[in-house]
Amino acid sequence: MGRCRVLVVGGTGYIGKRIVKASIEHGHDTYVLKRPETGLDIEKFQLLLSFKKQGAHLVEASFSDHESLVRAVKLVDVVICTVSGAHSRSLLLQLKLVEAIKEAGNVKRFIPSEFGMDPARMGDALEPGRETFDLKMVVRKAIEDANIPHTYISANCFGGYFVGNLSQLGPLTPPSDKVTIYGDGNVKVVYMDEDDVATYTIMTIEDDRTLNKTMYFRPPENVITHRQLVETWEKLSGNQLQKTELSSQDFLALMEGKDVAEQIVIGHLYHIYYEGCLTNFDIDADQDQVEASSLYPEVEYTRMKDYLMIYL
C-alpha cells in the first residue's frame, strides 16, 4: 500500500486519537484538524502537540468557517471523522464537512463518524436512543447525494465501555461480587479492542474492496455471549460472581425516572443484548457489506481474555 494523505477530524477524542496513531504508524501523511476551541483545553492541546512530535500536521479550521474546511480538505486524499456521537449537534456538524468535501472535489475516501451499531439497521430503535441512528443516516444521505466515495464502519462494542465492567450499568470497572446477566446471557455480541478498530479503519482507506461499502467488525474469537464474557473474567480473576438474570421487561423498566443520557444507554444495551442487533443478520456482499477480519487476516486482533488482563 502507498502513502496516503489523511485528515482526521476529531483526532483528540476517544477513538480519534487512536486513528491518528494508526495512520502515522502505517506511514501515511497524517493531518489533524485543530479547531479554535481546542486551544482552550490544555489536555487536548497537549495531545495535538504530541501528534505533531510524531510527524502529524496540525491544520487549523472551524466548522463555522466553510472556506477553512475546504482548504483543509484540499490537502488530503482521505477524510476520517470521529466527532462524538454523544451530542446530536456534533453529528450534524459533519454536514458542513460533506459540503467542504463536495466543493474541494479531491477526496478519494470519506469515513464518517459511526463506529458503533449500523444505523441503517436501527430504524426501529427505541427512543430516545434512535435519534443518534437517525442523524447518522442524515449524514449518510448527504454523502451519497454528493457522490462522495466512502466507507461506513460498524465496529460494534468498544472494550473500554463494554468489556472491563462486564457491560454493567454504572462504573467502568469489573464488579466484585454480583453481576447482572441480560436475558439468558446467550445472545452473541461483538467486542473490540479500540486500537484494533483504528488499525482496521486505516487499512480500508486504499482498499477498493471497501469502497462505498459498510465494513462490519466480527473477529471470530470476539463474537461471544454476555455469559461467556462474564465467565472469561471469572476464570482470569478466580472470583465467582453471583449472577442474576434480568428479563427484557425488567431491563426496559430501568428507563423509568432516568435522564435522557441514561435512557439512551439502556435502549442501546437492550438492542445489543436482548435483540442481538450486532449479530442477528448475515453480512451480504451483494448488499455492499464486508467483514474486517476476513479482509485483513494478517491483523493479530486482541481477544477479550487478553483485553481483560489489565483489569486484574
From Swiss-Prot:
Subunit structure: Dimer.
Residues given in the record as substrate binding sites: H268
Taxonomic superkingdom: Eukaryota
GO molecular function terms attached to this record: lariciresinol reductase activity; pinoresinol reductase activity
Organism: Linum usitatissimum (Flax)
Family annotation (CDD domains): PCBER_SDR_a
Binding site for NADP(+): G10, G11, T12, G13, Y14, I15, G16, R35, K44, R140
Function of the protein: Reductase involved in lignan biosynthesis. Catalyzes the sequential conversion of pinoresinol into lariciresinol and of lariciresinol into secoisolariciresinol. Abstracts the 4R-hydride from the NADPH cofactor during catalysis.
Family: Belongs to the NmrA-type oxidoreductase family. Isoflavone reductase subfamily.
Record's keyword terms, sorted: NADP, Oxidoreductase
Gene3D superfamilies named in the record: NAD(P)-binding Rossmann-like Domain (3.40.50.720), UDP-galactose 4-epimerase, domain 1 (3.90.25.10)
GO BP: any one term: benzene-containing compound metabolic process
PANTHER family: PINORESINOL REDUCTASE 1-RELATED, PINORESINOL REDUCTASE-RELATED
Active site per UniProt: K136
UniProt induction comment: Up-regulated by abscisic acid and down-regulated by gibberellins.
Tissue spec: Expressed in seed coats, but not in embryos, leaves, stems and roots.
Pfam family, one: NmrA
InterPro entries, per database record: NAD(P)-bd_dom_sf, NmrA-like, NmrA-type/Isoflavone_red_sf, PCBER-like
Protein name: Bifunctional pinoresinol-lariciresinol reductase
